[in-house]
Amino acid sequence: MISKLTVMTITMYGADWCSDCVRAEKFFVDNNIEFQKIDLELDENEHFVESEVLRRNNGKKSIPVIVFDDDSHLTEPTNAQLAEKLGLLS
């Protein structure tokens, strides 16, 4: 698990109907990792959110897009990719 000393800001752009989004959200919850979820379908700034997803994916509307505090991002990551990015693998 990530310690309180290494807390990073994580923002996940996704939707409730997206199975990869649901899986990524479960990964964060199961590992006690705080994150902000922005739902493409429900956010009042829907146009900004959609343009952010498209910008990070070279024009593709693939989700989830998970953005980290260093401005890097992962699109449709596996749990193993998330664990590696977050330093959970030993």
Range-by-range predicted roles:
Residues 2-34:
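Local sequence-structure signature of Cys/Sec-based thiol-disulfide redox active-site neighborhoods
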Residues 52-75:
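Short, structured active-site "lid" loops
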Residues 68-90:
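Non-catalytic, surface beta->alpha helical segment in thiol-disulfide oxidoreductase systems
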Residues 40-60, 88-89:
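Thioredoxin-like thiol-disulfide oxidoreductase module
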Residues 19, 41, 45, 73-74:
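Glycine-/small-residue-rich active-site loops that bind phosphorylated ligands and cofactors
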